[in-house]
Amino acid sequence: MRLTIVPPQGFNEHIEQAHAIHQEAQVSPWKLSTFADCFSKPYYGVFAFDNDKIVGYAIMLEVVDEATLMDIAVDSGARGKGIGRALVDFVIETSVKNAMREMWLEVRESNHTAIALYESSGFQHIETRKNYYTVKNNDNGHDKSNGNSAQKENAKIMKWTNPTLA
């Protein structure tokens, strides 16, 4: 696997592959045009490749000295191979390099795998947003047992603090 910043050549082919992963991973995916906009300033996008196939992506927004991990996903057939870890490590390294004081993200309360990854990368749970995410009626990938209505799920808000600026 190689992690590569979005190259200007072949962007359309790459963005469509990444958008397919986004559509699979998200309950309410963005339109292709909205998704593509997130790979240009002020956003920062990166693709993870396995040979010539995109197997994951991350989108980050930097404003002044604060970053937000806007979206991250790994192709379902490529999970468990360290791609998510490589993407999170890359955005953290980018934040350190760009002197970001902190990075924020939100994650579904039921996404225990992602939460464990973020916590092991230094993110801390700061607060919970009640009934934040939409849940599909027959969405087997998400636990609806958090006490909310059948259509909503809580979001954990997590923060990483740059140790070089603390």
Give the label of every model feature segment:
Residues 106, 119, 124-156:
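Conserved catalytic-core motifs of GNAT/GCN5-like acyltransferases
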